[in-house]
Amino acid sequence: MLKKDATYYIVEESVLPEVFLKVIKAKELLEKGEVKAVNEAVRLVGISRSAFYKYKDCIFPFFESSRGKIITLALVLQDVPGILSKILNIISDTNANILTINQNIPLGGIATVTISIRTSDMTKSVKELIQEIERVDGVKKIEILGREEY
């Protein structure tokens, strides 16, 4: 669970100590029901129970932490008819609640759009949503601008 008074960082997986990655893997095994107990999970991933309990509430995948939040997406799109509609349909199909849409006037065939969505009822992960939007022809760039609790 996120602590309101803590400082958080987004860190690339490749620079994390191995113990953190193993804690994440153990948590995934437990969440997916692939193991029934912490003892079994830590044994499979090769860490001690004390390491698991020390870090389990301090490390989690970024997209997992976006569940139940409001996220703001920034997109750079080609100026082609229907592209924004396709993106909004993809978001809607995940059961996300679209809160705001801001689109700038296209310049040089490119338009920038920001979309804020509530993620609590989504049927897909934020990562899957972003990957699906990236596959739309004409999407040049998509990134998460911000995230906040509600």
UniProtKB/Swiss-Prot annotation:
The organism's place on the tree of life at top rank: Bacteria
Gene3D superfamilies in the record: 3.30.70.260
Pfam families: ACT (PF01842)
All residue ranges annotated as the ACT domain in the record: 72-147
InterPro entries xref list: ACT-like_dom_sf, ACT_dom, UPF0735_ACT_dom-cont
Entry's family note: Belongs to the UPF0735 family.
NCBIfam families in alphabetical order: PRK04435.1
Name listed for the protein in its UniProt record: UPF0735 ACT domain-containing protein Csac_0995
Organism: Caldicellulosiruptor saccharolyticus (strain ATCC 43494 / DSM 8903 / Tp8T 6331)
